[in-house]
């Protein structure tokens, strides 16, 4: 009797494939639950198992029970429960929407109850323990318990050869079978339905037809097309290249290659289409409900994955910096799902913190559980049931961009996600290649390396998605080096041979820096004169003996007139520094190599500003007077100012030298002149003896290189006999100066 039930299911499975029928499923509290219609009150429930199959009409956006005109909806006025209605007039006009495998109702739905089966309501008012349910998933094949026992056929055994058949397992539907149990699916021969299967081998074509009820067994024929499904492994279909599968029985029609062309062609096309669809879906294995969402597609969340998205107009990959999920900084992040936890780079776990930031934690129990990744996107089971696919956004940080869950935090949203499986060894090879390529700064263009064609074919057939390409905009290299720019004209063209060996070796030879001084440009400009006058004044009170009256008087000890005449010289020196030698060795084969040496030079232009400042000081003699006294002979003093443009030696042989006398010859014993500090660190020597009128000239060099001025005062004249300039003094003053010397 079990055999008849299984065959009935197979007939139903064929009808489902032919008419796009499906079951409806969701996940609540990490359990797969299916839409089930209560046969008593026609209410729609969510239960662990169901045989109800549905179909969707895109033109009317209605969900029908398969093979009937009964629709699934609710009555807005008197029945808030989701039910099956045979008469559309007694139901609401709300419909459904189907996007790929995502099924949504046009009104919010709630599931109520403490445990399955749950009731589905559009209005939970007055009901307890209700939670909102957003979306459903469609399952293209119904759920079937695996049969592991041998079932014997109730009837007489035929004397002829017995047919050996196997039942094919669903390739994309999660089952309740324990993970450690191995299930052996096989080719199925149906009763009362003529089927045709054609091998995809290009050399031969085999047609299998049967109209009898075969004996069921779990034995696998050695030459038959077999499909093996194991937990945590991808399904692989193996086809025999030499022999074909033939099922024969006593009452069956003859199985030959001479079937009618019309039926053979039609059935072959249908079968090949079905086989191709099954092979496309076979890359995803059935996983536990906690770790796998709706089945189907090419993404396997239990093996390494990389995730990319569009960000600011560019496709970027998810990275990690050992603390957070990031963009454009850190290392490439590979993801896996283990028991609903999202693992990163095999050593970290993703946790959504209170700020909704994707942070990385060391312990699995501290991470967020409920992640589901498949072809339809990234999902997070929150509050115990499915929600829409989650969205992500990125906010700028000091070290780059950090990824947040959701878009309500004001960050820039990410979209157009792509998820690709990648092998661990391919990740290692990719990282090694990236490191090698970033270390090389110069390489010779040559033919690309090719691998064995057989290995390439096997890799393309076994299929996992290719690793992300090394696009600088997508995956920035973690290693940076200083690259020397080489003129393309310096590269030597090497003709490739039949088996070229492209070996580029770059070495930096330590060498002393070579400095070459180039052109020197000097520009001199004169500035205007700057004059400063400094007076030293003292007040003296004279009192006579026996007289109480005292007379105050003012004495000008000295007057210093300082004149600056700066001359600025601008000098530009071009210096060429050779500080790097690069040797590039290119080998055509093991014996022929060529070495090319490149010298990298740096040109430095040094600008020096030099200021030649001629400082002339005029020191006057002391004068006495009352409180209103002023400098005597001020015009005479001004006439004695020496400028750099004038160079007149004093005339000591003048006939009037003996006749002219100074205004005050006697020294002022009460007055002592203090040393005078000259600006710009200049040094002036002024006698503190009987002070007379004198002139001191000092030359100051101020050299400025870059932004750091250097002041170096250089006294030019040591005494009055070496003064450079023009001195206009009376004969008596000149005689006194000569006597002092």
Curated annotation (Swiss-Prot):
Glycans are attached at residues 232, 241, 461, 511, 669. Residues 147-165, 423-432, 500-511, 657-671 have a biased composition (Acidic residues). A lipid is attached at residue 719 (GPI-anchor amidated asparagine). One of its GO terms (cellular component) is plasma membrane. The keyword Membrane applies. It is a lipid-anchor; GPI-anchor. Residues 646-656 have a biased composition (Polar residues). It comes from the Eukaryota. Residues 1-18 form the signal peptide. Keywords: Cell membrane, Glycoprotein, GPI-anchor, Lipoprotein, Membrane, Signal. Induction: Up-regulated upon milbemycins A3 oxim derivative (A3Ox) treatment. It comes from Candida albicans (strain SC5314 / ATCC MYA-2876) (Yeast). Residues 183-197, 205-266, 433-451, 512-528 have a biased composition (Low complexity). It is found in: Cell membrane. This is Putative uncharacterized protein.
């Amino acid at each position: 009797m079990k055999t008849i039930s299984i065959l009935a299911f197979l007939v139903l499975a064929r009808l489902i494939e032919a008419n796009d029928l499906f079951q409806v499923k969701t996940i609540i509290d990490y359990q797969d639950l299916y839409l089930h219609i209560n046969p008593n009150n026609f209410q729609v429930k969510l239960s662990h198992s169901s045989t109800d199959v549905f179909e969707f009409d895109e033109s009317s956006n209605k969900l029908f029970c398969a093979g009937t005109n009964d629709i699934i909806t609710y009555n807005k006025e008197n029945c808030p429960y989701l039910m099956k209605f045979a008469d559309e007039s007694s139901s609401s006009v709300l419909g459904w929407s189907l996007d790929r495998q995502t099924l949504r109702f046009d009104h919010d739905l709630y599931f109520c109850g403490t445990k399955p089966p749950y009731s589905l309501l559009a209005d939970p008012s007055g009901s307890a323990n209700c939670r909102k349910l957003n979306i459903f998933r469609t399952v293209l094949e119904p759920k079937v318990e695996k049969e592991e026992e041998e079932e014997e056929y109730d009837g007489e055994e035929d004397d002829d050869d017995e047919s050996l058949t196997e039942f094919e397992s669903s390739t994309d539907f999660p089952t309740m079978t324990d993970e450690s149990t191995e299930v052996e699916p096989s080719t199925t021969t149906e009763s009362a339905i003529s089927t045709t299967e054609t091998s995809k081998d290009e050399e031969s074509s085999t047609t299998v037809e049967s109209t009898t009820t075969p004996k069921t067994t779990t034995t696998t024929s050695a030459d038959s097309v077999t499909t093996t499904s194991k937990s945590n492994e991808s399904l692989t279909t193996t086809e025999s290249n030499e022999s074909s599968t033939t099922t024969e029985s006593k009452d069956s029609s003859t199985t030959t290659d001479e079937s009618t062309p019309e039926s053979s062609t039609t059935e072959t096309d249908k079968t090949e289409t079905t086989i191709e669809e099954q092979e496309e879906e076979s890359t995803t294995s059935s996983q536990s409900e906690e770790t796998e969402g709706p089945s189907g597609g090419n993404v396997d969340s239990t093996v390494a994955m990389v995730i990319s998205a569009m960000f600011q107009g560019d496709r970027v990959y998810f990275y990690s910096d050992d603390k957070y999920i990031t963009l454009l900084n850190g290392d490439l992040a590979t993801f896996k799902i283990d028991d609903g936890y999202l693992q990163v780079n095999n050593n970290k776990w993703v946790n959504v913190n209170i700020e909704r930031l994707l942070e990385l934690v060391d312990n699995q129990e501290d991470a967020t559980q409920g992640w589901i990744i498949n072809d339809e996107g990234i999902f997070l089971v929150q509050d115990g049931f499915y929600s829409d696919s989650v969205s992500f956004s990125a906010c700028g940080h000091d070290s780059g961009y950090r990824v947040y869950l959701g878009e309500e935090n004001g960050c820039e949203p990410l979209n157009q996600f792509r998820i690709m499986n990648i092998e661990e060894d391919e990740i290692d090879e990719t990282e090694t290649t990236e490191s090698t390529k970033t270390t090389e700064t110069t390489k010779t263009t040559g033919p690309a390396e090719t691998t064995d064609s057989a290995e390439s074919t096997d890799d393309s057939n076994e299929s996992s998605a290719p690793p992300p390409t090394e696009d600088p905009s997508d995956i920035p290299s973690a290693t940076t080096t200083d690259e020397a720019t080489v003129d393309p004209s310096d590269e030597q063209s090497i003709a490739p041979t039949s088996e070229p060996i492209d070996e580029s070796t770059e070495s930096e030879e330590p060498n002393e820096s070579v400095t070459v001084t180039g052109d020197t440009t000097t520009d001199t400009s004169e500035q205007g004169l700057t004059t400063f006058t400094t007076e030293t004044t003292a007040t003296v009170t004279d009192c006579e003996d026996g007289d109480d009256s005292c007379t105050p008087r003012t004495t000008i000890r000295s007057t210093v007139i300082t004149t600056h005449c700066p001359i600025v010289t601008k000098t530009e020196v071009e210096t060429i520094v050779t500080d790097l030698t690069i040797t590039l060795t290119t080998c055509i084969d093991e014996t022929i190599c060529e070495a090319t040496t490149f010298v990298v030079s740096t040109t430095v232009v040094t600008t020096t500003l030099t200021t030649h400042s001629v400082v002339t000081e005029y020191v006057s003699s002391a004068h006495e007077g009352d409180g209103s006294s002023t400098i005597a002979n001020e015009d005479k003093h001004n006439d004695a100012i020496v400028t750099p443009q004038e160079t007149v030696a004093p005339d000591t042989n003048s006939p009037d030298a003996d006749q002219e006398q100074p205004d005050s010859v006697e020294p002022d014993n009460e007055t002592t002149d203090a040393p005078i500090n000259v600006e710009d660190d200049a040094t002036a020597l002024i006698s503190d003896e009987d002070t007379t009128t004198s002139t001191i000239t000092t030359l100051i060099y101020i050299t400025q290189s870059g932004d750091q001025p250097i002041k170096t005062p250089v006294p030019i004249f040591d005494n009055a006999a070496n003064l450079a300039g023009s001195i206009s003094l009376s004969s008596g003053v000149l005689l006194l100066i000569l006597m002092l010397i």
